[in-house]
Amino acid sequence: MNTSLSWFEQLDVLLNATDGNVVRNKQWLYPLGVSTELIGLCICFFCSSGCIFLGSPPQNSTAVTPAVLWEESEIMQKELKLLQYQLSQHQELLLKQLAEGRQAQVGSWKIPRGAPFLTWSPASFSSMPRVLSKRTYSFGAPKCS
């Protein structure tokens, strides 16, 4: 770009040169669910002269270069990996707690080993028929008087 142009004019030239490509990229990326921030970052990253921020004219000491953007992207990738690791650890903890909760719930459904009816001896069942036999039941048809 011509350095004799003001930064507004440089921006205008840059935007006019890239408008067609940006529109095509957006039309291609929007159906894929790519956010506008990510599209803007990609456009900014591949801009050969660095990003031009609208708030103030670019300063040589603070100009964003592809190398700086690459370093920032590497930092963001490391942060993303850290967040993924933390998320997987949290997910494992939640799954463990869920499994423990299910075990506790299943344990409440189980019959304890010392339950009285599990410890009765067969001899205690032999008295039941005698008790039942002492009672008289009439299973026949009801008698009419």
Curated annotation (Swiss-Prot):
Membrane found in the keyword field: yes
This protein's name: Transmembrane protein CCDC163
Topological category with respect to the lipid bilayer: Single-pass membrane protein
InterPro entries: CCDC159/163
Keyword annotations: Membrane, Transmembrane, Transmembrane helix
The organism of origin for this protein: Homo sapiens (Human)
TM stretches of this protein: 38-54
GO annotations of cellular component type: membrane
Entry's localization field: Membrane
Source domain of life: Eukaryota
